[in-house]
Swiss-Prot record:
Source organism, top-level taxon: Bacteria
Protein name: Large ribosomal subunit protein bL32
Source organism: Desulfatibacillum aliphaticivorans
Keywords: Ribonucleoprotein, Ribosomal protein
InterPro entries (UniProt xref): Ribosomal_bL32, Ribosomal_bL32_bact, Ribosomal_zn-bd
Segments for region (Disordered): 1-26
GO cellular component terms listed in the entry, alphabetical order: large ribosomal subunit
UniProt-listed GO biological process terms: translation
Length: 58
């Protein structure tokens, strides 16, 4: 099994890990009710998408 010949510094390790971060989800407000929702998804509170009611909610 391969082993490293020299120890990698913490800065080299951290530079390699810079692309492994998580991104926060892009949240927009629903134009009908104003509640937060994910873009290109049905609003969970009012059930509308692109101005049409797709799911009946109470």
């Amino acid at each position: 099994m391969a082993l490293p010949k020299h120890k990698k510094s913490k800065s080299k390790r951290d530079k390699r890990r810079t692309h492994q971060k998580l991104t926060a989800p892009n949240v927009v407000s629903c134009p009908q009710c104003g509640d937060p929702k994910l873009p290109h998804h049905i609003c969970p509170s009012c059930g509308t998408y692109k101005g049409r009611t797709l799911i009946e909610t109470d």
